[in-house]
């Protein structure tokens, strides 16, 4: 079976030029399975659901628990009807074949006997004796009347007490209970959920049903649970658009490919490296190398933050040495420069003895400063994003109702404020990851770095204008005594800033995902233009009359303006 990455890559190869924010299909009903519509937000859904689905793309659908159960039952009924088997047997088949109805049909009609044997569905059920004679339990070997004995399709008799203990143990052991077989070691007959419903306790039945529900998502390559803590929604993903960012109704956005938080415009490998770098010890070692020196005796790193050059290592070492030359302090004094200088160090430095050490320290310092620059801004945008999410919640819970009363405007006409906050939250996320992008952008590609920093700076400026408008300018209307004649102008301004900022950030994302290809194309055009001009000048020098003049003039094509 192909891996999930292979499936997604295949979709990517088949797709044309990616439209990253338009989604893949017009509706989730366009999927191959032809499953019923389970949309993003119902018409009577509350505002929070509407807000959470604001950026929902058409290449995925959010599934609630009731949606998942409905799909499970639909699949079970389809298999049961087509194969003329019970729903219990159909659920066992689907669970074995990872809830793929098509594969169940293919395997069953190709070799029904083999499938029955593999899955544990017997063609003919063994009927226990109908008389009143007692039966012996195959586990405890006690004799019981027929009403105290239970069995599955194989007919092996076990008392209800042993069955209950067997089922309880397997359920508490984990999801393996979904593949339960007859307790007889030589028998492979499957145990369905009907036996669980009959003999398990209420808590165990609830746990079994939870495993059963989760198996539908976890066994399906195009479905995943939302990774947000405490979220019970699942995502049904349709590959093909090249955009792997999905947004759950809980408001958490994540990457379908790596299940980390949504991270466009950087790819999954860059995110993995960045997260690892943020949590690894490499930057700690860089800091130690840049800001400390090892004790000459015990090699423990020591930081000098103030005072003279006389250093004393911590116990039990207690070695006294010079910070500059690392020599024993007993060899130092007024003749070597006193407490704040070291002649020995200056002489050795001039002779080049510390060149390699200083070079390493300088490299570590530069590396640390560069990382700190990008990390601080990455973290700052994350903090700003969290603050914007809190402000959005406050706008939903308090400000909209208050503003509606003050301005005599229905809340339905104030959604432009929520749209602005949503756009700010999204832009903060994008801006945050541009700093990871910039950190890994090769330093020798100067043109790309300049273009990137320009785009990033413009994005920050535009976002700040939008943020200030919705955060500061709105206050005057919240504290106003009554309707303000300037409110419509504010609405127009905020809606316009939201639209402009959205378009700019979409273009920024596309530019970065394309590797800033515009820089290369502009460089190529400039090179081509320069070459054409040079050729034109040569022709003009050698040629005669208007012909050579036109040759020179024709080299000025529209590319020259790029």
From Swiss-Prot:
Entry-linked InterPro entries: Ariadne (IPR045840), ARIH1-like_UBL (IPR048962), E3_UB_ligase_RBR (IPR031127), IBR_dom (IPR002867), TRIAD_supradom (IPR044066), Znf_RING (IPR001841), Znf_RING/FYVE/PHD (IPR013083)
Residues involved in Zn(2+) 2 binding: 154, 156, 182, 187
Stored CDD domains: BRcat_RBR_ANKIB1, Rcat_RBR_ARI7-like, RING-HC_ARI6-like
Annotated coiled-coil segments of the chain: none
Compositionally biased region (Acidic residues): 27-39
Major enzyme class: transferase
EC number annotated for this UniProt entry: 2.3.2.31
Region feature (TRIAD supradomain): 133-346
ZnF IBR-type span: 206-268
Tissue-level expression: Ubiquitous.
Active site feature: 308
Reactions mediated catalytically: [E2 ubiquitin-conjugating enzyme]-S-ubiquitinyl-L-cysteine + [acceptor protein]-L-lysine = [E2 ubiquitin-conjugating enzyme]-L-cysteine + [acceptor protein]-N(6)-ubiquitinyl-L-lysine
Textual note on the cofactor: Binds 4 Zn(2+) ions per subunit.
Binding site for Zn(2+) 1: 137, 140, 159, 162
Region named Disordered: 1-39, 524-562
Binding-site residues, Zn(2+) 4: 255, 258, 263, 268
GO molecular function: ubiquitin-protein transferase activity; zinc ion binding
Binding positions (Zn(2+) 5): 295, 298, 313, 317
Zinc finger (RING-type) boundaries: 137-187, 295-325
Biased composition (Low complexity): 525-540
Known cofactor(s): Zn(2+)
Top-level taxon in the UniProt lineage: Eukaryota
Role this protein plays: Might act as an E3 ubiquitin-protein ligase, or as part of E3 complex, which accepts ubiquitin from specific E2 ubiquitin-conjugating enzymes and then transfers it to substrates.
Record note on domains: Members of the RBR family are atypical E3 ligases. They interact with the E2 conjugating enzyme UBE2L3 and function like HECT-type E3 enzymes: they bind E2s via the first RING-type zinc finger, but require an obligate trans-thiolation step during the ubiquitin transfer, requiring a conserved active site Cys residue in the second RING-type zinc finger. The active site probably forms a thioester intermediate with ubiquitin taken from the active-site cysteine of the E2 before ultimately transferring it to a Lys residue on the substrate.
Protein name: Probable E3 ubiquitin-protein ligase ARI7
Species per Swiss-Prot/TrEMBL record: Arabidopsis thaliana
Gene this protein is translated from: ARI7
